[in-house]
Amino acid sequence: VSQPTVASAIRAALLTADPRAKAMAARQVARDWRLGRLAFRFDVPVPDRPARPETPELLPPNRMPKRGKGGSERSRIALWHALAHIEFVAIDLALDMAGRFGAEMDEIFVGDFLSIAADEGDAFRPAGAQA
């Protein structure tokens, strides 16, 4: 039985559209890497774009409502929502770095970026729970 590769695990996480499932997948990839369950092989390409949920529609910042300074409940909810989006994108960025450049770098580089992805996944949970 061949060991799953770090590249295939990263690719699967990047192709996960649901934000909470992606956060869990990032934590699982990092855990599997730490425990030696993933081979240091880059046998599948990183997707050109990570998967995104169908809704909500992503809009450019200039088309989004102003968040205010967090004084009102509505403003605080908007702020938590924005933070959740930032964490979601940060998961993808860290996974992409590990998958796209890991073969040219080393295991420490991959481990560092998988750790970042897991940390962002952990941070996504409370932010996502607030939105």
Question: Residue ranges of each PLM-predicted region?
Answer:
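Non-heme di-metal
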Residues: 1-131
